Amino acid sequence: MIALSAVRKRETVSGDIKSQKFVPLRRVGVDILEQLKERVVDEIENYFLMRHTTCLASQLTALENAVSAVLYGETGTVSAVPISPGGGKSTLIRALLKSLSVCFRSMDDPVAKHFGGIIVVVEKSSEGHELESLCNESAGKIVATLVESANDFNLSLGHCPNGTATRFDECLRRACPDYDSCHLMQCSRRLHETPILIMLHARYQRFMEAIETISFWEDVTQQRYTRTLLLIDELPDMFEEGAINLGILNSAATELDQLKPSYHYGVRMQKQELIYQWNRYVQHPFVKLQKVISTDYGPYGLLMREDVETAGFQVGPLEELREKLLAYANGTKAEQIVETLLTCNHCYSAVANTVSIFLPRLKRLHGWEHPATFIFSGTATLSPELTDNPHIHLLNDCWEESYARLTFYSQRGDAIKPSKTDFRRGGHLQAIAHWISHVITQMQDKHQRILVVTFKEFSEPLWNMLQPYHNILLPYIDGCDCPQPKLPYYGGLNGSNQYLESTCVICAGLNRFEPKDYLMRALALDEDGTITSEIQQALNSTTPVRLDQMPSVMSIQDFTLARDIVQLVFRSALRHHYGADPIDCWLLAPPQGVLSALKDHFGNCNFIEIPSLPESCVQATLTGKRYAGSETLASKMLNWLQNWDGSPVSPNDIRQATGLSQNQFKEVRRHPEIQKFFETHVKTSGSGRHTTYCRIDMKEE
C-alpha cells in the first residue's frame, strides 16, 4: 500500500450525473505516481520473463513512455499510443490493471482516490474474462466487472443461467423465461458496481460519446466515485456515416408511432403532432433535396449546407423538433437524425436503388465529461482518424526495429482481380485457387506453415479447393480457439495469436470497402474544409471527375488497405519482434499507394513485383466464364483441350466434340489464350481439311 501524508478528499456529487464535473487528476505527489510507474514496469518485465521472450531496448522504452503517459494523463484528453502488434500492448494493459487493482482494494488508498476507477475496452470476450480474473485475484476481492451480453464464448463456458444455450444461436434472448434474471441479458445493471469496468468494443460504441453515463460507480454505502481513466485496446470505429433515405425516415416515423400506446388521448395527440412536424421539417425537405442531386459525375455528389437549408432543413424548426422528441422519448432514431442534420456542415449524395444522403462525421471522444482516454493501436500511424484529428494527441513512436526480413510480393496480371465482386464471377474462384497453389508450391520449401486469408464468403470453398495443402495451411480459429474447416478471413482474425507459426502470408483478395465508405471517411475528416474545396473545384472544372476517385479519397483507401495488411502480416511470426525468420507476404494487385504506405511503415522491408500470372490461372478464368448462363465459345474450346488425351485429331473432330460450327471454330481459334495454348501444347501438321493436331508430350515440352 502506498502511503501519502496528505490527500485532498475527492468530491462526490449526487443527483443528475450530467451536472457532475470531473475532478482534475494530478492530486497525488509525483513521487507516488513514479513509484506506481516502477511497479507497472516491473510487472511488464516479469511478463516477458515468464513467457521467455526477449524485450528489445526500444520496445521497453516505448512501453515505459506509454505507462508515464497513462499515469499522468489529464481528463478530457485523448491520446493514441502507437505500439506495434505483438510489442507488449496487451501486456502493458495487464500490468497496469494488476498494479491498480491492488490499490482499489480500498478507496482510502491515495492512488485509488486519484483515479477513482478505470474503464477498459477490449476486442474479445476471452480477453475480458482474463482481465476480470486478473484484477479480482490481484486485489483479493471483487474490484472489476466484465459487462457483456451472451456470446459464443461465455455460453460455451456454461454461463447460461438455465443451461439451455451453449452457443449464441441457441440463446432465446427475450423469448427466454429467465430473461429478466439473466445476468448476460441484464448486464447493463452492473455498469456501476466496481471501480474497474471492462467491456467489449461493440458495447463501447453505445457509450462512446456519452461516456459520462458509465463513468461513475457506487460502493456499498452508495458513495459515488468517478472513473477518470479509459484504456481502449485497439482502435474503435470512430466514423458515423449519418445515412438518410426514405426507408430510414419511414422507419424512424414508425418507431415514434409504435413507441407508446395510442389509446391514451394525450399520447395520441402528442404522437400526431410529432409525426406531423417530422413530415414537415424532415421528410418533405428530404424529398425536395433529391431534386438538386445530380449524377453528372457518377453516382456520388456533394451537397453544401446551403443546399440542405434551401430544401427546408431549417435550424430553428429542427431544434424545436429535437426538444419535442427528447420530451417524448430518449434515444429514438428520429432524434439521432435531427441531431445529425443540425451538426453537419456538408454531405454527399449516393444514387443506387434508392437515393440517399450521407452526413458523415467523426465521433467525439474528448471533452471535460470524458475520462483521460488512451487508444492503444499497432497501426495508429496508418489511421487518419488519429493522425489527422486535432483533438487526439499521437504519442511519439520511439520504436526502432529492422524489417529487412520482411518481403512483400506484388502479383500483377489482368486475369484475376482482388475484389469480392470479381471473386463471384464464373471461373474466378478457380483461378484464385490455382494462383494460391502456385504460390504455395514456390514457398513450401522455405516455409513450414502458411497463412492464407480471404473473404469470409469464400473461405470454406477455397479451403476445400486447396485440400492437397492442408498439411501446410493454417485453418480458421473461432472465438473458442477451435479450428474450423475453412480459411481465415478478413474480419475474423481480431485478437487471435493462433497463427504465429506461419512465416508466409497470402492475401487472397483485398479487403476493400464500398467507394462511398472511403468518400464518407474523407469528408468526416475534413474539419478545415480542404477536401470539400478540392471537390468543389473539381466539379466546377470542364473535365468530368468521380468523387470517389478524387486523390484525397483514394488516399484514405490506400491507408485503410495498408492498415489491414499491416495487422494481417503481424498475425505471422513477424509478431516475434526478436525473431530472425524470413517473412513473406503475397499481395494480389495492390495499388501503388498501398505499397508506398507499407514502405513508410516498415522502412527497410523488401518489395518484389511479379509481372504475370501463371498460365493455369489464366486458363481457369477462361474455362469458368459464362454468358447468359452458358459456356462461352472459348470456355468450351479450352475445356476440351485441357481434357484432350493428346491423340491426333482434325479440326472437324474438335468441332463435333465441342458443338462448334465452322465459323465459331475459326473465331475461337483467334482468341489469345486459345492461340497461346496451341503454340505451347499443340503440334500442327498438314493443311486445309488434312490438318491434324497432336498434343505435345511432357518430354517434348
Where are these regions (language model features)?
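ASCE RecA-like P-loop NTPase motor cores
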Residues: 2-701
